[in-house]
């Protein structure tokens, strides 16, 4: 109760934090800041007890501290706001490619396709037609129209890996758990649509 909190003004985080403290009847002293860099500086200088932003932002900022382990990211989730890829308005083809890239990585995870086995799985027909479609042996409708080769998803999975591999490589080292970013079968929110 009564902690000072560095909070970026004009953001949904500011509103969500105010609601969280009101609902939980906790008093706090907001320390208004304008940028993440300013929040980091004020927090490290001790001008606020707590620093708040999106979980991924907290984790990546904490990783830059001299002693990251001396700082704790609290487990409370104040709000649920989806973060994802963004493309400029009006480039529908690029938006489709970005969207299907994410879906292909999630489908790869769901189907057990990894960077280690993608090329092998893509070299012969499989018993699972969805794997065959995803890896280009039974080309997806619309891939060529979007300017993609029939093995576009195979290339992504072989070079980058599935969603879990990418998450584990890039975000897990920051101390982030999958949480809602897991597949629906694993208790998360990611539902992989049929690959057709």
Where are these regions (language model features)?
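Short, well-ordered beta-strand segments
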Residues: 4-8, 51, 86
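Solvent-exposed loop/turn segments at secondary-structure junctions
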Residues: 10-15, 36-38, 56-60, 79-80, ...
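A ligand-binding cleft/hinge motif common to bilobed small-molecule-binding domains
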Residues: 16-23, 37, 44-45, 49-73
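Bilobed "Venus flytrap"/periplasmic-binding protein-like clamshell domains
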Residues: 1-40
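Periplasmic-binding protein-like
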Residues: 63-102
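Extracytoplasmic
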Residues: 12, 25, 80-82, 96, ...
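N-terminal hydrophobic or amphipathic helices and topogenic motifs
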Residues: 99, 103-196
């Amino acid at each position: 109760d009564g902690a000072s909190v560095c909070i970026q003004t004009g953001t949904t985080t500011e509103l969500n934090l105010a609601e969280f403290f009101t609902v939980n009847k906790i008093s706090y002293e907001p320390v208004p800041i304008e940028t993440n860099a300013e929040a980091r500086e004020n927090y490290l200088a001790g001008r606020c007890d707590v620093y708040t932003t999106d979980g991924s932002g907290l984790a990546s900022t904490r990783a830059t501290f001299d002693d990251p382990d001396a700082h704790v990211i609290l487990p409370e989730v104040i709000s649920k706001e989806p973060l994802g890829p963004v493309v400029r308005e009006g480039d529908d083809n690029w938006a489709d490619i970005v969207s299907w890239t994410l879906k292909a990585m999630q489908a790869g995870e769901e189907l057990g396709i990894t960077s280690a086995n993608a090329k092998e799985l893509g070299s012969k027909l499989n018993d699972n037609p969805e794997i065959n479609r995803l890896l280009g042996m039974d080309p997806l409708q619309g891939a060529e129209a979007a300017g993609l080769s029939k093995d576009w998803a195979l290339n992504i999975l072989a070079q980058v890996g599935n969603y879990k591999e990418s998450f584990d490589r890039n975000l897990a080292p920051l101390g982030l758990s999958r949480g809602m970013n897991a597949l629906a079968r694993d208790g998360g929110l990611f539902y992989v649509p049929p690959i057709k």
